[in-house]
């Protein structure tokens, strides 16, 4: 039995609760309330873990596993980490998708003794639960991408999912409805770190697919966690509204998704949730659909290995701010599909491209701004420091300077859309002055260190700091005052551990002390000692000044933060403006740096790319002083399919990828790597390029290839762009040719969308004779005797060779192996010529490889019954493939 399934009695029995120490009983009580977490239990200067948590954490963190005494003769496993190094160790645990509960001491040992005697246990409780989707600390999350927590709720008919996603670090929250067939595609776009699901979905295909495809934590909740009435009340209470319509027209499942995510934040943050805005309602169709495989194959935001290097994002990202980098990440993850919105972005890019002088100045100034989105979240969640406030101050100051650039540049004719971006840059003088007058420039990270508030901001702060810095002077002043009052020039003020501060006079001067304010404390052989209420008060102030000033500074800091939070709406708008400026100036910069051009968009199936280049490959070649070989791509309603044959290693795959990437870059509002580009808006891009055996998932190369191809054919529309490379290569030649042929027919006749199709099956080139919207292209080469030069140019025509032996020779295979392979190839070519002609003849005569002459129907009662239960409109591609295998067994 796992811990999570234990009731309280079973749990206490397991750990011998009744005979445990009081401290260990306290630990067990808190652990039982957080069975799904690793519990970090504060013990003085360490956070300690016990029992199973300790064993697991010691392995993950690479720290020593020790023990803390015994319980019923059984040693208690224990490991610990220093409290000041907590974030370092949390990073490792969160990276492994663990959920961590932080249990802190809520009082000092001295306070505990006052409360309950010397045996009292310090009060402790969980102050926060940290999960992959609820992190806000800078050291624990990437500054370059969002950190989404997602709640997914299926509608009653299971045809749609409502997905609410929030980036707690920036206080951004969204809600979207997604068709059941598009759920994984939407999750691929979001790349969530943590997903909330109902326990009812625990054994579903959806949960299984999420675990296989995405590196995230799934947190299951009981079904009642998503109950409509409960979730609606949570929303009303959180946003302080009376009617659910106050957050917009949303469905029941959307209410459940939003309410459940707010409840989860409340549980993990212990009610300390930032002021989240009302969720922004997203139209799923407003973004281009790009599935998980395509994102991976095209290496849009990461490379195949999951790293940034070699990705499109890495090549395009010359932003100078963290929030600008995140916005570019969002743009690339979510290309637009609305022409008006795309053109609006392109016009902004064009404006800055036409004014590169101001772009250079803006980019330099933006380097002085801070990530105020995340600063503001830390402030609202009481996890900020004075440096967060200073960051806001410097950003306000810089924004005003940037705004001045536009005002000074009278020659600039500012379009309305630029005016909207720069309007928030005028700043907020009241907020700036508040921070400027109150927060010291050298403010520490830790409020407990003091020294955060300027002395002149508050008279009491000035007074207490004066005591701290000038305590001896105040004692000297009082001594001089008492000398004048008594006429005793030898009067001193001294200190010892028994009396503290005291007035010390010689015995012969005792008759001069006439004022009753001097209170006798002690008589020694040579002197008499006194005190006064004035001296006692000064001593108390000196002793407590440090504590008092830190306490006062915290109060003042909290009040300043409250006033900053009141300006949170403006600060978020300012952050959006600055990040937008950064991204569009970045687009202008790369357009100038790499000679990109403004694309043109249409509502038809146009796809005219002149002298297009692959941005990542080109950037890599430029570093070695080499140039990229550009290529054209022409697709249209009349010529929708480009069938490419040609040798290995000649650039087919690069050509396929570059045209898909150019489309994505264009639809995010950037100029593109081409001489010109005219594109009919693409609603979905699918890419089937290469495959590796996925033995862990039990899928061969061919099965993975067929599943991906099946999904592409099922989900594509007329406005989609399909990129296919070597379909059918994972099986026998004739099976492969047959599948590739049929797939091409389906795309041509049924989908009628644009498609780039690369293949080694030269037999497919004859399809141009009876598929009018298909055109043959090949890779240009130069042959000189046995030598071959790949020119990397895509030209009209066909190729009847793959030049595999030439590539093998380049790879360094032994000459004897190459020569023997050439002999074998010659024999195979002679054998296959006649067979190839037969295949082509059959295909040409029938127009489809699968329109064979029908055979007499052989009755199979089981097969008949199976067919009767199938609704072809409701089964998924994967289910269809499984049925084929099942029918094959029946036959």
UniProtKB/Swiss-Prot annotation:
ATP binds at residues 646-653. Pfam families: MutS_I, MutS_II, MutS_III, MutS_IV, MutS_V. Keywords: ATP-binding, DNA damage, DNA repair, DNA-binding, Nucleotide-binding. The keyword DNA-binding applies. GO terms for biological process: mismatch repair. The keyword Lipoprotein does not apply. InterPro entries: DNA_mismatch_repair_MutS, DNA_mismatch_repair_MutS-lik_N, DNA_mismatch_repair_MutS/MSH, DNA_mismatch_repair_MutS_C, DNA_mismatch_repair_MutS_clamp, DNA_mismatch_repair_MutS_core, DNA_mismatch_repair_MutS_N, DNA_mismatch_repair_MutS_sf. Transmembrane segments: none annotated. GO terms for molecular function: ATP binding; ATP-dependent DNA damage sensor activity; damaged DNA binding; mismatched DNA binding. PANTHER family: DNA MISMATCH REPAIR PROTEIN MSH1, MITOCHONDRIAL (PTHR11361:SF34), DNA MISMATCH REPAIR PROTEIN MUTS FAMILY MEMBER (PTHR11361). NCBIfam families: mutS1 (TIGR01070), PRK05399.1 (NF003810). HAMAP family: MutS (MF_00096). Belongs to the DNA mismatch repair MutS family. This is DNA mismatch repair protein MutS. It comes from Rickettsia typhi (strain ATCC VR-144 / Wilmington). The lineage of its organism: Bacteria, Pseudomonadati, Pseudomonadota, Alphaproteobacteria, Rickettsiales.
């Amino acid at each position: 039995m796992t811990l999570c399934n234990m009731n309280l009695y079973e749990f206490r029995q397991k750990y011998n609760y009744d005979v445990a120490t009081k401290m260990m009983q306290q630990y067990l009580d808190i652990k039982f309330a957080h069975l799904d977490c690793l519990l970090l239990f504060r013990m003085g200067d360490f956070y300690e873990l016990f029992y199973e948590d300790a064993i697991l954490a010691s392995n993950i963190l690479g720290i020593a596993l020790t023990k803390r005494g015994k319980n019923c003769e059984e040693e208690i496993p224990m490991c610990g980490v220093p409290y000041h190094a907590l974030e370092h160790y949390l990073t490792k645990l969160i990276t492994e998708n663990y959920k961590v509960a932080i249990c802190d001491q809520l009082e000092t040992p001295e306070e505990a003794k006052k409360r309950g005697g010397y045996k009292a246990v310090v009060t402790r409780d969980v102050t926060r639960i940290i999960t992959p989707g609820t992190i806000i600390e800078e050291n624990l999350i990437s500054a370059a991408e969002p950190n989404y927590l997602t709640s997914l709720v299926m509608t009653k008919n299971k045809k749609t999912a409502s997905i609410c996603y929030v980036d707690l670090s920036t206080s951004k929250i969204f809600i979207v409805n997604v068709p059941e067939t598009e759920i994984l595609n939407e999750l691929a776009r979001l790349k969530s770190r943590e997903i909330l699901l109902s326990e009812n979905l625990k054994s579903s295909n959806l949960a299984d697919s999420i675990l296989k495809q995405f590196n995230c934590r799934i947190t299951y909740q009981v079904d009642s966690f998503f109950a409509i009435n409960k979730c609606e009340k949570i929303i009303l209470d959180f946003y302080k509204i009376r009617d659910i319509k106050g957050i917009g027209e949303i469905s029941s499942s959307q209410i459940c998704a939003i309410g459940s995510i707010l409840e989860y934040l409340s549980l993990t943050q212990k009610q300390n949730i930032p002021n989240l805005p009302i969720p922004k309602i997203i139209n799923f169709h407003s973004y281009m659909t790009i599935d998980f495989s395509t994102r991976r194959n095209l290496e849009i935001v990461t490379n195949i290995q999951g790293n940034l290097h070699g990705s499109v994002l890495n090549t395009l990202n010359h932003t100078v701010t963290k929030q600008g980098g995140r916005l570019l990440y969002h743009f690339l993850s979510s290309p637009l599909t609305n022409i008006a919105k795309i053109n609006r972005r392109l016009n902004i890019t064009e404006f800055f491209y036409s004014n590169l002088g101001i772009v250079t100045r803006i980019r330099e100034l933006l380097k002085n701004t801070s990530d105020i989105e995340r600063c503001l979240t830390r402030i609202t969640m009481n996890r900020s420091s004075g440096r967060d406030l200073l960051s806001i101050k410097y950003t306000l100051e810089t924004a005003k300077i940037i705004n001045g650039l536009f005002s000074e540049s009278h020659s600039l004719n500012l379009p309305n859309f630029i005016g909207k971006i720069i309007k928030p840059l005028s700043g907020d003088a009241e907020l700036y002055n508040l921070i400027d007058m109150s927060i010291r420039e050298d403010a520490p990270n830790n409020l407990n260190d003091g020294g955060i508030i300027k002395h002149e901001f508050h008279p009491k702060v000035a007074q207490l700091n004066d005591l701290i810095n000038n305590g001896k002077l105040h004692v000297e002043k009082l001594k001089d005052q008492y000398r004048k009052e008594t006429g005793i020039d030898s009067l001193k003020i001294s200190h010892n551990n028994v009396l503290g501060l005291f007035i010390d006079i010689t015995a012969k001067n005792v008759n001069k002390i006439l004022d009753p304010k001097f209170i006798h404390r002690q008589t020694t052989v040579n002197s008499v000692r006194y005190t006064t209420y004035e001296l006692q008060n000064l001593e108390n102030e000196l002793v407590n000044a440090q504590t008092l000033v830190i306490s006062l500074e915290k109060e003042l800091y909290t009040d300043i933060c409250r006033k900053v939070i009141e300006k949170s709406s403006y600060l978020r708008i300012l952050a959006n403006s600055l990040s937008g400026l950064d991204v569009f100036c970045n687009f202008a910069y790369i357009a100038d740096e790499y000679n990109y051009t403004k694309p043109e968009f249409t509502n038809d199936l146009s796809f005219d790319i002149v002298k297009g280049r692959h941005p990542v490959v080109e950037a890599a070649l430029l570093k070695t002083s080499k140039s990229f070989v550009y290529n054209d791509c022409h697709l249209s309603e009349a010529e929708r399919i480009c069938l490419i044959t040609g040798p290995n290693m000649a650039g087919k795959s690069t050509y396929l990828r570059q045209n898909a990437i150019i489309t994505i870059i264009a639809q995010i509002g950037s100029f593109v790597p081409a001489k010109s580009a005219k594109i009919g808006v693409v609603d979905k891009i699918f890419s089937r390029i290469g495959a590796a055996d996925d033995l862990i998932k039990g899928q061969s190369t061919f099965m993975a290839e067929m599943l991906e191809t099946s999904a592409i054919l099922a989900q594509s529309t007329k406005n989609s762009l399909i990129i296919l490379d070597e379909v059918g290569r994972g099986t026998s030649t004739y099976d492969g040719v047959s599948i590739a042929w049929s797939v091409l027919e389906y795309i041509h006749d049924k989908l009628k969308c644009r498609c780039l199709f690369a293949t080694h099956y030269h037999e497919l080139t004859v399809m141009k004779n009876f598929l009018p919207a298909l055109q043959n292209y090949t890779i240009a080469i130069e042959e000189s005797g046995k030598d071959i030069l790949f020119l990397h140019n895509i030209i009209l025509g066909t190729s009847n060779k793959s030049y595999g032996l030439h590539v093998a020779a380049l790879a360094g295979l032994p000459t004897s192996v190459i020569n023997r392979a050439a002999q074998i190839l010659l024999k195979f070519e002679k054998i296959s010529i006649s067979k190839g002609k037969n295949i082509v003849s059959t295909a040409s005569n029938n127009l489809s490889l699968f329109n064979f002459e029908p055979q007499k129907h052989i009755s199979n009662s089981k097969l008949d019954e199976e067919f009767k239960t199938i609704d072809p409109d409701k089964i998924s591609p994967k289910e269809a493939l499984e049925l084929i295998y099942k029918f094959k067994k029946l036959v």
